[in-house]
Regions:
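Charged, amphipathic alpha-helical segments and their flanking helix caps
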Residues: 1-36, 47-140
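A short glycine-rich, His/Asp/Glu-containing loop-to-beta-strand
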Residues: 40-46
Length: 140
């Protein structure tokens, strides 16, 4: 498989092996699209997003692989929104500053949490959508 797909798989495995405050099974997907009825339960999607290749030396390149971790669930109140935002931070804490057990060549570089809450999803559907964008670097 490709480097970015292998990293996304390793992120998925890492999330599924860890213990969090919420019960879920992360899935690697290319298009995390769900019907509202499916979102009664929590969905955590790991999506290969982008790849940027930069020069590292005359013979090597840095491959910066960006992975989105999406958190989605239909919510009834703001208290549940707060719980899921805290859950997203748990995931960020789990991934930051660590190498992936299933892809140790990938070095963690950064995490961005945007949107923390997608306001249009919350307003129109009472659905929380929160996205962590994680960047890993591989020297090749």
């Amino acid at each position: 498989m490709s480097v970015i797909t292998d990293i996304a798989d390793a992120v998925t495995t890492s999330l599924n092996a860890a213990t969090f405050s919420e019960d879920f099974t992360a899935e690697r997907l290319h298009q995390p699209s769900f019907e509202l009825t499916e979102l009664q339960s929590l969905h955590v999607s790991v999506v290969p997003k982008a790849l940027e290749i930069r020069n590292a030396s005359r013979q090597h390149s840095f491959w910066d692989c960006t992975i989105d971790v999406g958190i989605q669930q239909k919510v009834d109140d703001d208290a549940r929104v707060d719980e899921l935002v805290a859950f997203a931070e748990e995931i960020a804490d789990h991934l930051r500053l660590k190498r992936l057990a299933d892809y140790p060549l990938a070095a963690w570089m950064a995490i961005e949490h945007d949107p923390v809450v997608a306001s249009e999803h919350l307003d129109q559907h009472r659905q929380l959508t929160s996205v962590l964008t994680v960047t890993y670097r591989v020297k090749r």
